[in-house]
Structures are given as C-alpha cells and as structure tokens.
Amino acid sequence: MIRLAAIDVDGTLTDRDRLISTKAIESIRSAEKKGLTVSLLSGNVIPVVYALKIFLGINGPVFGENGGIMFDNDGSIKKFFSNEGTNKFLEEMSKRTSMRSILTNRWREASTGFDIDPEDVDYVRKEAESRGFVIFYSGYSWHLMNRGEDKAFAVNKLKEMYSLEYDEILVIGDSNNDMPMFQLPVRKACPANATDNIKAVSDFVSDYSYGEEIGQIFKHFELM
C-alpha cells in the first residue's frame, strides 16, 4: 500500500509557463484526505517550496535545491549540503567562461544555479566532475550540485523519517533530473510530457500532462 507520494514540481504540477494545474491541487487534497502523505521535491529554492507547502496545503515536508535542503512540518529548515564549494567554483569559472550567476542564488543554501552559453557546457561539466560536483539542466535552469545531492537522497530521507518500505512510496516526475529517485525500488509514475528515459522506467505513464495527470495517477494506484 502506498503511504507517501514524492512529487516533482516543474513540468509535473505545472505547465510550460510554470502555472500550477488547479486539477493537480484538487487531486492532491483528495488523496491527502484519504491518508496519503505528499511531499514536493523541487530544484527551486526554499522560499518557493515553503510558499507552495503553505498555500497548497501540502501535508508533508518539502525539499528545495533537488533534495539539498528541506522545510519540515515542525517549521524547521534542514540543510543537508553546503554551497560553499559550488559558489567558489562558479566564481572561478565565471572568470574563464560564460558561466554566470542567476537571481535565485541569493536564496540558495545547498547548491548553485547558473546560466551558460552552449559552447562552454562540456568544458564546465568536465571541470565540475573533476572536483566532485555535478551539473545538469532541468529544462528550466542549470544546476551545480554536490555529488550525492539529488532527489533520491530526498526520497531516502522521507523513507527514514516515516519508517517506510520502498514499495510504500510513489514518485512522480517528468525530466531526467528526476531519474535518481526513479532508480530506487519505489513505485513510479509520470505525465505524458515526461522524457523517454523517465517513461521507460515508470510503472505507469499517464495520458495527461503538466499536472492534469495527477488525478489519473492517484486513481491508478487507488489513492483517491
């Protein structure tokens, strides 16, 4: 029996313009009323996921920066990684490449966001990996992360917090940066707009996209 759903935000609950699906909100609230714990896992910053938790009524902890930091139900913020090294890397690379800071870095605590011109991506990726960092593009922003800082880390943290088995957890996501949590032995589902890699490892692929899929997924797994 599934007891917890860990859900990505951009492209999973939102459309191409990053507007949240009202149908997704209704489905989440219906499932929560039946006892499901819902957690959001986003690449965005804590102020954003905190606001989503409060205004959408999410009943579980929410994670920002792809699992690097969490806002818990007791009102505390728990930081699992540092951005000291990633910020220094950005500062260094910005002097030699087109890698440059973005607005949301003023709120980031566990990772670093950036923009970059396409011709510099391979070089910066190799430099990052040689120093124990990982870079990826979420479809909305470039992220510079510490190794091991990903959504699988967040799901494992939830598993520990709620004393769950993997088969009691459902993950829902749409893009390749969700893949770490899809590689865990959990239940997996995705919207129709998901990447082929995510679809290939999903237990259920919805006919609907951009948040409209949440109700169908929850019904498939008998959560509402």
Curated annotation (Swiss-Prot):
Ligand binding (substrate): 151
Regulation: Inhibited by Ca(2+) ions and by high chloride ion concentration. By contrast, low chloride concentration (up to 50 mM) slightly activate the enzyme.
Stored Pfam families: Hydrolase_3 (PF08282)
Chain sites annotated for binding Mg(2+) 3: 10, 43
Ligand binding (Mg(2+) 1): 8, 174-175, 178
Cofactor mode of binding and number, as noted: Binds 5 Mg(2+) ions per homodimer.
Keywords, alphabetical: Carbohydrate metabolism, Hydrolase, Magnesium, Metal-binding
Record EC number: 3.1.3.18
GO cellular component, one term: cytosol
Catalysed reactions listed for this entry: 2-phosphoglycolate + H2O = glycolate + phosphate
Binding-site residues for Mg(2+) 2, renumbered to this chain: 11, 174
Cofactor requirement: Mg(2+)
SUPFAM superfamilies: HAD-like
Disulfide bonds: none
Record-annotated active site: 8 (nucleophile)
Gene Ontology molecular function, alphabetical: magnesium ion binding; phosphoglycolate phosphatase activity
Family stated for the protein in its record: Belongs to the HAD-like hydrolase superfamily. Archaeal SPP-like hydrolase family.
Record's function text: Catalyzes the dephosphorylation of 2-phosphoglycolate. Also has significant, but less efficient, pyrophosphatase activity, since it is able to catalyze the release of phosphate from inorganic pyrophosphate (PPi).
Record note on quaternary structure: Homodimer.
Record protein name field: Phosphoglycolate phosphatase
